[in-house]
UniProtKB/Swiss-Prot annotation:
InterPro entries in the record: bL21-like, bL21-like_sf, Ribosomal_bL21, Ribosomal_bL21_CS
Sequence similarity: Belongs to the bacterial ribosomal protein bL21 family.
Protein name, as recorded: Large ribosomal subunit protein bL21
A single GO BP: translation
GO cellular component: cytoplasm; ribonucleoprotein complex; ribosome
Function: This protein binds to 23S rRNA in the presence of protein L20.
Pfam families in alphabetical order: Ribosomal_L21p
Assembly notes: Part of the 50S ribosomal subunit. Contacts protein L20.
Cytoplasm among keywords: no
NCBIfam families to which the protein is assigned, alphabetical: L21 (TIGR00061)
Amino acid sequence: MADTKPAAEQSGTYAIVEASGTQIWLQPNRYYDIDRLQAEVDDTIKLENVLLVKDGKGTTLGQPYVKDATVSLKVMAHRRGPKVIVYKMRPKKKTRRKNGHRQELTRVMVESISVGGKAIS
């Protein structure tokens, strides 16, 4: 039986980048929700804080960043995450406090991962 996965998934191409104060594992042609970025819908963003790149040839680990490595992201939409309820109460007292929070998110599609100006995906 033939493998029906895309070529990027078969070879295991991915990059770990630093964005919005967190480290994110990104694979080509997939979308991710990350903390809100200051960009318009359909803009292309280049992330240069690439910590690790893995392709069919091997793994490149940065110290702390991989030299000349970039990840291109396309902004698909701005959205809000699920509501998180924070409820605080003091037992045996009438003190109760309920707050809600929805995180502002940006949905991005990984267009390409490139090292040294050459796209690997």
